[in-house]
Amino acid sequence: MTQVKVAALQLPFSDCVEENIEAVSKLVREAAAQGAKIILPPELFEGHYFCRTHDEDHFARALPVGEHPVVAAMQALARELEVYIPTSFYEADGHHHYNSLAMIDDEGEIMGVYRKSHIPDGPGYSEKFYFRPGNTGFKVWKTKYGTIGVGICWDQWYPETARAMMLMGADILLYPTAIGTEPHDPDLDTSRLWRRAMIGHAVSNVVPVVASNRIGTEGDQRFYGHSFICDERGDYLAEFGPSETGVLVATVDTVQAKKHRAAFGFFRDRRPELYGRLTQDI
């Protein structure tokens, strides 16, 4: 299919799983009613962003993909509405814990699981305490509407993530996110940088990008929203500010993007034989 409507959800979350499932489900229904076929909720929407502090009690939040209530709820919703819902969740796998995403298709089936590759560790974002670096490698999924590539939050800052998914055949890049203020520097607003990084991926890979972020204040941290959808030239098709709750829906044209990608020549002119340094540790 040439054109597809995609959606990004933006909303605040409580620390009650059931309340958050209900809130996200409501917005998923709104997006589907507007014709969206690929609907992206924010990262770890099951509760508060617990990685602000070190607390071993939070490990109990993690569950296997087949037992997680968020995944089960989105499977049922995807099946009912016939939409794709890339679903972020806290995964337990034996002794290991991952920041993961289940790609749920329009029949409610799990196409696969991606585990976040890049794990941050800084004030307010102490993810290394809770998450093991992903062992799935980057993933893309073929859907009825093109091939989807998904990176999770911190992955979005790395051009290697986007380029790897593009080389695997991605037609659209999606980034569920939980990002906000920096507790160590109240004057630092990364929302502009955050958007520019992903707009850069859109331009340098000539690909539409969808980013979904939470809003609201949790403890001493304010999550700044600014969810957006852009086309393959980096132009905004839809965007939110720092406080709106709702649904962004826009139409992207993957065939047009493919044509523009060929015309720009970025992939034609690649020199992989020169890039060996990229795979070496510093």
Language-model segments: residues:
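CN hydrolase (nitrilase-like) catalytic-core segments centered on the catalytic cysteine
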Residues: 63-85, 153-247
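Short beta-strand scaffold segments in enzyme catalytic cores
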Residues: 87-89, 100-103, 139, 227-229, ...
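Short polar catalytic/cofactor-binding loops
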Residues: 10-15
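Short, acidic/polar
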Residues: 19-28, 158-163
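Cys-nucleophile CN-hydrolase/nitrilase-fold catalytic domain and related Cys-dependent amidase chemistry
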Residues: 17, 25-107, 111-113, 179-200, ...
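Extreme N-terminal starter segment of soluble prokaryotic enzymes
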Residues: 1-7
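Active-site catalytic loop in hydrolytic enzyme cores
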Residues: 63-66, 76, 92-172, 176-177, ...
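A conserved C-terminal secondary-structure "cap"
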Residues: 255-282
